[in-house]
Amino acid sequence: MVMNAIRRPRSSSPVQRVARRLVEPAVFDFWASRVHPLWSWERPLARLRERHQAAEGAVTLVLQTNRHFAGLRAGQHINLGVELDGARITRSYSPSKVAGNRIEITVREVEGGRVSQHLCRHARIGEVFALGAAFGTMTLPAAVHGPWLFLAAGSGITPLMAMLRELDAAGMPVELDLVYWARTRAEVCFADELAALAARHRGLRVHLRLTRQADGPAAPRIDDTDLAALVPELGHRQVFACGPHGFVQSARAQLEGRVVRFEAEAFTPPRALPGEGGSVALTLSRSGRTLTVPRDASLLEALEAQGLRPASGCRMGICNTCACTRREGITRDTQTNARSGEPDATVRLCISAAATDLTLDL
């Protein structure tokens, strides 16, 4: 099966190495963007070429990438940087289609979400976004064998749709059931395409589970008994699941160990475990600033509350965009409550809280 390969990053040419001594890449990027919006020294960028309504409350954006984007595999995620009110805000998205230098992301508007609201309501053709390197391990295996099961809830359909499209291009070489939970039929993304795929491939079956449909009974949440009745030979399946954290945890608890393989990704972070109250001193070694931060908030949230904007992406400990060095002090993992105090160790701001006075390389 043909897989979407990640391209090898371009190395600096001799001309670039000489030119770097004469001009800063940031200065080059500023002037180059006046000539062509996707020109840059080495920064991966993408320009919005098309936008389509994907479902109620969701849009699909077609992006053209520049030559510095190294590519990705179906099922992976990318960080998308959006300029809002003079500041760049980064969020993670799973492309729903990958084709050469074109990628598609399908974004559902989130209440209070500045980036999703901008992308769904205000982003215009020609707008340029910063791109991060691809990350994520839930991709199509090189060897295709046995029946598969895709489990999607809400926006969790997007990475699985990218994988479905790649399987379609390869002639659907596997028997596959997709079970897709959405609140209402109007919120089902890719409804027509999914129906067409199922009609084209005898081995593909699509099951929609609507949990809040007004004109019919509500489908049950994920349940192993329901799945066993819906999907033949459940125990022989390779399972790929994506959805909110609670959905993924429920799927894992019910299926892991009972199926041939279980792979999953969540698009929301787990609920942070409660920490100790009070506040501590946080010193930023590069700027020399010392802040007072709460012990029960992630370091990323605490810094943002002080008006700072450290680099971030997924906000749930996966992409490592927010990683920095802890010089001194003890941090607490907000997902496990485990503590760590090794000096000069890397911490992820989005899932770490200060347990004691702390010094970070920021």
Describe every region a protein language model picked out.
Residues M1-S40, A355, L360-D361:
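Iron-sulfur (Fe-S) cluster-binding modules
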Residues A169-L176, G329-A338:
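Phosphate-handling active-site elements
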